[in-house]
């Protein structure tokens, strides 16, 4: 099967890459440049094969739309820094983006050919106590299981939820205040329980949230992603939940590790292990479709690590860490 990598293009990378992944052995091979683009740091596929990236142009940042053959459809750009997150809403025919530097959430309408037109945008206002929280920093914009739009804002320690109509117009619904200085980055929902796991970048924690199904979140538990004796820099990055809802995985940049948690009966978390990611700055990772493997992309060491996964206890065993992908910061199937 094919596996895709989004990258920074500050050093040697040229854009979006694709490789072959052997679902039986976990072996990676045949890396190829799929799309030449500046800093396509996050990617999202539509079911029809269209690909959306947050790559930048000389005119500014935005979202680029490509067809199933990786041919550019259009690039919706506005002045300023590029976006950091993109997601597809199949039911409404929309695409969502998050702009970290501007604190914006953007909504685009998909056209018949898959190209995009900007439909709406909102700008968050706020700040936090950490030095990286001088202003709002939207880092994630995606759907709840009941189809509200939820946005994590690292700058003002909040989750915002919005109603979205069929035209992509947003209506503010609710907000959740995380621990001051936590820096909410990404959110992952449990597949069956009314629970969400909030990845907090700045204090290296996961906040386990009760989700009432109407856009409202309530804190149930806070748990660290680091060993108790770690005192150096760390910023968490990606979070994933296994398909069976039994385990949660989180990446640490700085400690350069993957934290493994067991989901208990009430959906709270218990640490299982923290394993080296065998690279520098594991900004993103993904579970293979059958959840037998976990694949980690490293931004600063240009390598990809493949772990096999014990589905009974969640533990990871490294298979390889020598497949080279330059400046990889996003990985998806």
Task: For the regions a language model picked out, list residue spans one by one.
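Short loop/turn segments immediately following the C-termini of beta-strands
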Residues: 8-10, 56-58, 100-102, 110, ...
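Short loop/turn segments immediately following beta-strands, especially the blade-tip
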Residues: 19-26, 66-69, 107-117, 163-169, ...
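A short beta-strand motif characteristic of beta-propeller blades
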Residues: 29-35, 71-77, 120, 126-131, ...
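Blade-loop segments of beta-propeller domains
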Residues: 30-92
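Beta-rich, blade/repeat-based domains predominating
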Residues: 37-48, 79-90, 126-146, 178-193, ...
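Asp-box/WD-like beta-propeller blade repeats and closely related beta-sheet repeat scaffolds
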Residues: 72-140
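Loop-centered beta-sheet repeat module
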Residues: 149-204
């Amino acid at each position: 099967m094919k596996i895709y990598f989004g990258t920074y293009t500050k050093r040697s990378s040229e854009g979006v890459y694709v490789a072959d992944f052997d679902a039986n052995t976990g072996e990676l091979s045949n890396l190829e440049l799929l799309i030449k683009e500046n800093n396509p740091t996050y990617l999202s596929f539509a079911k029809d094969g269209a690909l959306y990236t947050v790559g930048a142009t000389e005119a500014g940042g935005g979202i680029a739309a490509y067809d199933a053959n990786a041919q550019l459809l259009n690039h919706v750009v506005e002045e300023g820094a590029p976006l950091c997150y993109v997601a597809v809403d199949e039911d409404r025919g929309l695409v969502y983006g998050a702009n970290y530097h501007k604190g914006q959430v953007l909504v685009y309408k998909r056209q018949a050919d898959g190209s995009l037109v900007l439909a709406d945008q909102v700008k968050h206002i706020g700040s936090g106590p950490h030095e990286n929280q001088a202003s709002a920093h939207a880092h994630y914009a995606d759907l709840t299981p009941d189809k509200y739009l939820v946005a994590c804002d690292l700058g003002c320690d909040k989750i915002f939820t919005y109603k979205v109509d069929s035209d992509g117009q947003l209506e503010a619904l609710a907000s959740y205040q995380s621990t001051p200085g936590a820096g909410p980055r990404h959110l992952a929902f449990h597949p069956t329980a009314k629970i969400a796991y909030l990845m907090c970048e700045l204090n290296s924690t996961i906040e386990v949230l009760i989700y009432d199904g109407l856009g409202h979140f309530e804190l149930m538990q806070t748990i660290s992603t680091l060993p108790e004796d770690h005192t150096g820099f760390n910023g968490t990055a990606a979070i994933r939940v296994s398909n069976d809802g039994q385990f949660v995985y989180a990446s640490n940049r700085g400690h350069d590790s993957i934290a493994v948690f067991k989901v208990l009966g009430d959906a709270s978390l218990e640490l299982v292990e923290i394993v080296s990611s065998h690279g520098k700055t594991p900004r993103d990772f993904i579970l293979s479709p059958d959840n037998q493997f976990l694949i980690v992309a490293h931004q600063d060491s240009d390598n990809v690590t493949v772990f096999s996964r014990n589905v009974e206890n969640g533990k990871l065993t490294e298979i390889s860490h020598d497949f080279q992908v330059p400046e990889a910061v996003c990985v998806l199937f």
